UniProtKB/Swiss-Prot annotation:
Gene source species: Oceanobacillus iheyensis (strain DSM 14371 / CIP 107618 / JCM 11309 / KCTC 3954 / HTE831)
The UniProt record lists the keyword Iron: yes
GO molecular function: 4 iron, 4 sulfur cluster binding; metal ion binding; rRNA (uridine-C5-)-methyltransferase activity
Domain TRAM: 7-65
SUPFAM superfamilies in UniProt: Nucleic acid-binding proteins (SSF50249), S-adenosyl-L-methionine-dependent methyltransferases (SSF53335)
Binding site for [4Fe-4S] cluster: 78, 82, 85, 164
Name used for this protein in its record: Uncharacterized RNA methyltransferase OB0768
The family this protein is said to belong to: Belongs to the class I-like SAM-binding methyltransferase superfamily. RNA M5U methyltransferase family.
Length: 459
């Protein structure tokens, strides 16, 4: 059978009317039924585009000129185009519609659960300046230290991108001042090609509610010339700085942080709150970057868990214990599991900070730990999972199914893997009751969800 040749060729130019959006936020137009995906174009817009890649079933294009614009188009607040904010040309209403549609679509096509209620997405009242953390590369140009995010799909630093409309405004003040200090005191930027130089990255973490600031300098060696003068100027300029840290990363790697961390000034941690709970945050802590929406997400997870005072709960992928402690406010006992030992140490400290003595944290892989707990007679009423983007391993899902909790609450940062895993849990004897999307990352194509499942009566 002859192969069907796509009706377009690379480098051809077309004027097209766009009709839809992909999950990534790319505009979709069709040429003789062949889909062409083009970034930064919206439905109902007409645009002149150049074909840049041709696959068998779809292609990609580049926007050359808009000839008709949508009422949903807005002027981007940032013109740097680092690739982090894929949707900043799109009205917030349309962003929410797109994300809602993505969740509906995977629930239908992947999970085959099109009858399950997907509630209207919970967006932000002020969808800007929400990120409480940045780790930004440092480079050199014409003998001057520069900082900025990498250009999309490259390691070229976009020079002196000191401000970002999704970063906490305190970060936007600290970064340019810090860059000026690096130049003032002659700090040499690291060059990843030659593996020479000193300063690799600058990380800034901010407590959204406490206003605490931590500054982390990631260096190639433990040497840090002029550090005392730099610290003096930083702490005088920003009294809310509570911690200045040096992290040493001597490897040729894209991983930002190395193994050795040393506090140069101040505290080991900064602190922030989610609801009534306080959390200690170290340079390496995984702490949700949008604490406002994290509270919304966790409140919904707690609602779906429907815990009473006699319930025993397992929190898999518990991290630094943030969800665990929310659950412990209602439950008789919470068991948290996490594979990263440092995260468990943070979790134990956070439990102590909040006076929680009904939480027990363990290091290990949940799929191996939970069967042992079951053998020891632990029968959880509720299991809460919050896995990485890849979703849950099949071994873990099978271990969870074998424990037969009354309810499962699945917190997800990837609707596609959520839908895949819901299908497995449905086939294992659980029923998906409802799904709640939450917009944790405005201006980006990411969407979080909380799903509630209950054990079917026949089980």
């Amino acid at each position: 059978m002859a192969k069907t040749k796509p009706p377009v060729n690379k480098n051809e130019i077309y004027t097209l009317t766009f009709e839809d959006l992909t999950h990534e936020g790319n505009g979709v137009a069709k040429i003789e039924g062949y889909p062409l995906f083009v970034p930064e174009v919206l439905p109902d817009e007409q645009a002149k585009v150049k074909v840049v890649k041709v696959n068998k079933n779809f292609g990609f294009g580049k926007l050359l000129e808009l000839t008709k614009t949508s009422s949903h188009r807005v002027e981007p607040t940032c013109h740097v185009h680092c690739g982090g904010c894929q949707l900043q040309h799109m009205s917030y209403d349309l962003q929410l519609q797109m994300k809602q549609g993505q969740v509906h679509n995977v629930m239908k096509k992947v999970a085959h659960l099109d009858q399950v209620p997907v509630h209207p997405i919970l967006g932000m009242e002020e969808p800007s300046h929400y990120r409480n953390k940045v780790q930004i590369p440092v480079g050199e140009k014409n003998g001057e230290v520069i900082v900025g995010f990498y250009q999309k799909r490259s390691h070229r630093i976009l020079q002196n991108q000191d401000t970002c409309h999704i970063q906490d405004e305190a970060i936007n003040e600290v970064l340019p001042f810090t860059r000026q200090l690096m130049n003032k005191y002659g700090i040499q930027a690291y060059d990843e090609k030659s593996h020479r130089g000193q300063l690799r990255h600058i990380m800034v973490r901010v407590g959204h509610y406490t206003k605490d600031i931590m500054i982390v300098f990631v260096t190639k060696t433990s040497k840090f010339p002029e550090k005392d003068r730099i610290i003096k100027e930083l702490t005088e300029q920003f009294p809310q700085v509570k911690s200045i840290v040096q992290n040493v990363n001597d490897q040729r790697t894209n991983v930002v942080l190395g193994k050795k961390t040393k506090v140069l000034w101040g505290e080991n941690y900064i602190y922030d709150k989610i609801g009534d709970l306080t959390f200690a945050i170290s340079p390496k802590s995984f702490f949700q970057v949008n604490p406002v929406q994290t509270k919304v997400l966790y409140d919904k997870a707690l609602e779906y868990a429907n815990i009473d005072k006699d319930d025993v709960v397992i929190d898999a992928y518990c991290g630094i214990g943030s969800i665990s402690l929310f659950l412990a406010q209602k439950a008789k006992k919470v068991y948290g599991i996490e594979v990263v030992p440092e995260a468990i140490e943070d979790a134990k400290m956070n439990a102590e900070i909040n006076g929680m003595n009904n939480v027990e944290f363990s290091v290990g892989q949940a799929e191996k730990v939970m069967p042992k707990w079951k053998e020891q007679g632990l029968d959880p009423d509720v299991i809460v999972v919050d896995p990485p983007r890849k979703g849950c391993d099949v071994d873990f899902l099978e271990a969870m199914i074998a424990m037969k909790p009354k309810r499962i609450v699945y917190v997800s940062c990837n609707p596609s893997t959520l839908a895949r895993d819901l299908r497995i849990l449905e086939d294992g004897g659980f029923e998906t009751k409802q799904v709640q999307p939450v917009d944790m990352f405005p201006s980006t194509n990411h969407v979080e969800c909380v799903a509630e499942l209950t054990l079917k009566l026949s089980n």
